[in-house]
Swiss-Prot record:
Protein's cellular compartments: Nucleus; Cytoplasm, Perinuclear region; Cytoplasm; Cell membrane
Source species: Danio rerio
Protein name, UniProt field: Ran guanine nucleotide release factor
Recorded name of the encoding gene: rangrf
Domain of life: Eukaryota
Keyword Cell membrane in record: yes
Effect of disrupting the coding gene: Morpholino knockdown of the protein causes bradycardia and weakened myocardial contraction. Expression of hcn4 is decreased, and this may be the cause for the decreased heart rate. Morpholino knockdown causes defects in heart looping during embryonic heart development, probably due to the decreased expression of cardiac transcription factors in the anterior lateral mesoderm.
Lineage, highest ranks first: Eukaryota, Metazoa, Chordata, Craniata, Vertebrata
Record-linked Pfam families: Mog1
GO cellular component: nucleus; perinuclear region of cytoplasm; plasma membrane
Keywords of the record: Cell membrane, Cytoplasm, Guanine-nucleotide releasing factor, Membrane, Nucleus, Protein transport, Transport
GO molecular function: guanyl-nucleotide exchange factor activity; small GTPase binding; sodium channel regulator activity; transmembrane transporter binding
């Protein structure tokens, strides 16, 4: 079932076991944050300023590095970009974007500013909408190694995690319903 985003201006289909984090805590107006109900996985959708100074293929890397900075994973060896590839228009519902880019990488991040760092695979899809001076960034955080000293170490080992295919289903289903969201 399609879930409304940003007051119904966008929508997407999410995997089962999704929790809307805005029901638990305050989320910035430019973000929608969802978490797996039993794992530390999350999917974040952000409306960001269009980065006109960055070419399309490099824009995905630009936003990844910005997220790495927010995650305090900016030192050498704490993040890597594995692949950046264009998503064919035929594979997405967001027909208003000039291009879409899928990036896969990893970051060493700590939860709640803890010392213990977890290895998180980060998959991002960047939808470029220059006509609205907006980049839509969708991020799938998929922890693959949890440090034994992390507060996440006591996680549910029986939980069925989301897959990359689940994330691709979300990004393929993202639709713009009301361009007024861009101001």
């Amino acid at each position: 079932m399609s879930r409304p985003l940003f007051g119904g201006a966008l929508s997407a289909v999410f995997p089962s076991s999704v929790m809307d984090i805005s029901e638990l805590r305050q989320i910035p107006d430019n973000q929608e944050v969802f978490a797996h109900s039993q794992t530390d996985q999350s999917i974040i959708i952000e409306l960001l300023e269009y980065q006109s100074q960055v070419q399309d293929a490099d824009a995905a890397r630009y936003h990844f590095e910005d997220v790495a900075g927010s995650n305090k994973a900016i030192e050498n060896g704490t993040w890597e970009v594995r692949v950046v590839e264009q998503v064919p228009q035929s594979e997405i519902s967001m027909q208003e974007c000039s291009s879409a880019w899928l990036l896969s990488g990893a970051q060493l991040v700590s939860k709640f500013n803890e010392e213990a760092k977890n290895t998180v695979n980060v998959h991002q899809c960047l939808f470029r909408l220059p006509q609205f001076t907006t980049d839509i960034l969708m991020t799938f955080n998929d922890p693959v190694f949890i440090n034994p000293l992390s507060s996440s170490a006591a996680g549910n080992m029986e939980a069925i995690p989301w897959t990359l295919q689940d994330f691709q289903g979300v990004l393929q289903s993202l639709r713009l319903l009301d361009s007024g969201v861009f101001g």
